[in-house]
Amino acid sequence: LTLRVVDFHVHPIPRIISEKELLREVELAGVDVAVLLALDVDSYHLEDKRTLIKFLEECIEYSNLNCLSCLETIKHILQTCYTSNEYVAKLVKNNPNKFIGVGSINPSKNMSYVKEKLKEIDKLGMAGVKLIPTLQFFNPLKEKSKLEKIFEFCEEKQKIIILHTGCDPSIWEEPAFSQNANPAMLKYYASKFKRVPIILAHMGSYSRRYPGIWFDEALELGKKYSNIWFDVSAVPYLLTEERYVEKISREVGWDRVLFGSDYPV
């Protein structure tokens, strides 16, 4: 049996990289199979006046950043990063031996939208659902009915769920803005949906300012629930720094740890 190199976490963002460039980079890196993630994000959330005021108030309270400039940066990030389910499915269809596609749904939108996106992911034959509480502006415990719908779908259709855990660029580097991506928020779902593999992207650790921010919370969840998996995309220090390596070995082992690059972001 030939061991294959799998990159579990790749963003084929069309505004950043073309299909041709992505294929070339995957080949150059010696990757046999890449898992491509859709990203259902946009700035509509910030167009609601009340939401916008709340956001700016929090920005002033928690941070000394220039909040209006920060708002523009966030809008730019969201508009740039949008990657549709259809686009990812097209790349997979064009390169079936090289790519596996994972869809995305924004749970901060209404229930009928969530149901529509689940149908779309099913029809496109995608391997699972990617959720990103930071860029999608949702609290996993406050959107319980929508998240349960997504988990029930994945349970029934035998699909995976990938959840971003840790901070994110710009304002989301401030932990106060990234609390929704703390792995501790997912205990309810890990316990209720034991047959759904839940992958904690970045192992709770992604943060330039506070590396390893919720590493312990991620391990805690993984120790308790065998359906919790991890990827180490964008957090290579978890594989090289002794204190992290030892703790992973001791507390959860390596069988549920997946390699990912987060390329090209």
Model-predicted regions and their roles:
Residues 127-128, 138-259:
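Catalytic pocket-lining loop regions of alpha/beta-barrel enzymes
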Residues 56-171, 175, 234:
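Active-site gating/metal-coordination segments in enzymes
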